[in-house]
Amino acid sequence: MGSEDLERLLLGYALRDAVKHGGRASVGSVMSMLLGDHPELRSRAREIASLAARVVEQVNSMPAGEQKRLLSEQYPELARFEEQREKGDKGLPPLPGAVEGRVKLRFAPNPDFVIHMGNARPAIVNHEYARMYKGRMVLRFEDTDPRTKTPLREAYDLIRQDLKWLGVSWDEEYIQSLRMEVFYSVARRAIERGCAYVDNCGREGKELLSRGEYCPTRDLGPEDNLELFEKMLEGEFYEGEAVVRMKTDPRHPNPSLRDWVAMRIIDTEKHPHPLVGSRYLVWPTYNFAVSVDDHMMEITHVLRGKEHQLNTEKQLAVYRCMGWRPPYFIHFGRLKLEGFILSKSKIRKLLEERPGEFMGYDDPRFGTIAGLRRRGVLAEAIRQIILEVGVKPTDATISWANLAAANRKLLDERADRIMYVEDPVEMEVELAQVECRAAEIPFHPSRPQRKRRITLCTGDKVLLTREDAVEGRQLRLMGLSNFTVSQGILREVDPSLEYARRMKLPIVQWVKKGGEASVEVLEPVELELRRHQGYAEDAIRGYGVDSRLQFVRYGFVRVDSVEDGVYRVIYTHK
């Protein structure tokens, strides 16, 4: 980044800080904002601090009105953010250097498994920014490691399905394994420019770099290295015998940054790729492929986890080599979902080592998007929680209670109410003044016109939960009448609702015997799956698989399957 661009950035941050703090900006705050948005500048922090001090002094000498005017005119996105903050609006902060209509972002999953809550964060955040700036969104499958991160053929479509369910759409789609010739072309150009070379020292090459030395081929000219690269492509080297390295600093304090590997040989006869089989032997590493594609696809902003900060430094080496302008890099903290496993490797291990115990990648005990969907969590709830967390650099843990609260608020407006009893007790009905009574119960309190009619007559049987059917207790059957529990009989007392209110009677759910549906409730509790048996009212038969319901006084559930008249539902939350 040139000095003029740097000074302009510092001026924007200083104006924003001054407007936020009554006309006074501080060097510390300005540097924090700059390095948070541009971690690649951290190595120049000492040099930049003196420039920041001059810019802050300049801004602090301005009248407050002038500060606001300059911020609004020259940095409208930063000004908009301050306006949102003053109003208390929640939302994502502005992107540095963003121009409406020219922002382009990407979500780039590895299709070695389905996506989980942690992966959903960059997908949703990038998509939201693309919408905010009327920009474009790219979906890019990063599948260039068939050896250690073997792609799954089915994962491509499963990821697409999960993204669509989350409301994430994209304008362009790419699969890196289908772009191999592009990577070869850029590798050749990097070698021609003298900033990449073929290390054919095998295992010794890595050992040399660990001592701050290097393979002698580093000192060869571009022509010789290009010849070696063509031999790699033609299969004259075996896996592990030769790699292409970016020329960085063989004595860099961080060994992983010393002439890192850009291309390597993978024996695809042993490790075939699910899309291209054994067509290619030489494969780009993650950092090389990402750098090339982010440039070729004109990505303006890269938003990803802070675990990629070291990768950012590696990728900048490619940009410097090729003379490309890098995108803006923004790193946010890791995201955890309390009580759920998000690790792909751990989930795969559980599925492999404990077959038959879990339902698959979409088991409701897992934090995969498919698992949360199967549990009954709505996409809107996930999106809402992730946007609230935003792009903060600190790690964040979402509690299940918070996600459930967001989901409950949405479900409460949508889910029909169904009566369900667990651990049932059969009771006989004895009405006092009439032979029969009819209950008209709305499926949803806000839509009273949709209701079911259930008629009970003297001698009919009903099912109550054991904890409600306490001897001598008075209670009200929902929508019907008031009763006393007496030796297996429900004896009607005053039928009025006023009586129930005056006596503060519990209003309980009930199921008429004879039309009941068998229900199995699966309750996920961390890695345990508790099973409960009960009965639901006949009205449940109007709902199919994937219906979200509220079992009255029990909780929200999602219908997972209906087999032989038995409804299997998954307990979502209270």
UniProtKB/Swiss-Prot annotation:
The principal localisation class reads cytoplasm
* Role, per record: Catalyzes the attachment of glutamate to tRNA(Glu) in a two-step reaction: glutamate is first activated by ATP to form Glu-AMP and then transferred to the acceptor end of tRNA(Glu).
| InterPro entries according to UniProt | Gln/Glu-tRNA_Ligase (IPR050132), Glu-tRNA-synth_arc/euk (IPR004526), Glu/Gln-tRNA-synth (IPR000924), Glu/Gln-tRNA-synth_Ib_cat-dom (IPR020058), Glu/Gln-tRNA-synth_Ib_codon-bd (IPR020059), Rbsml_bL25/Gln-tRNA_synth_N (IPR020056), Ribosomal_bL25/Gln-tRNA_synth (IPR011035), Rossmann-like_a/b/a_fold (IPR014729)
Report the subcellular localization: Cytoplasm
The protein's matches in CDD domains, at most eight in alphabetical order, are given as:
GluRS_non_core
Q: Which keywords, in A-to-Z order, does the entry hold? A: Aminoacyl-tRNA synthetase, ATP-binding, Cytoplasm, Ligase, Nucleotide-binding, Protein biosynthesis
- Organism annotation: Aeropyrum pernix (strain ATCC 700893 / DSM 11879 / JCM 9820 / NBRC 100138 / K1)
* PANTHER family tied to this protein: GLUTAMATE--TRNA LIGASE, GLUTAMINE-TRNA LIGASE
Alphabetically, the GO molecular function entries are: ATP binding; glutamate-tRNA ligase activity
Q: What class of enzyme is it?
A: ligase
Q: What is this protein called?
A: Glutamate--tRNA ligase
Locate the motif 'HIGH' region: 109-119
Q: Tell me where on the tree of life, at the top rank, the source sits.
A: Archaea
Q: Which GO terms describe its cellular component?
A: cytosol
The EC number(s) given in the record are 6.1.1.17
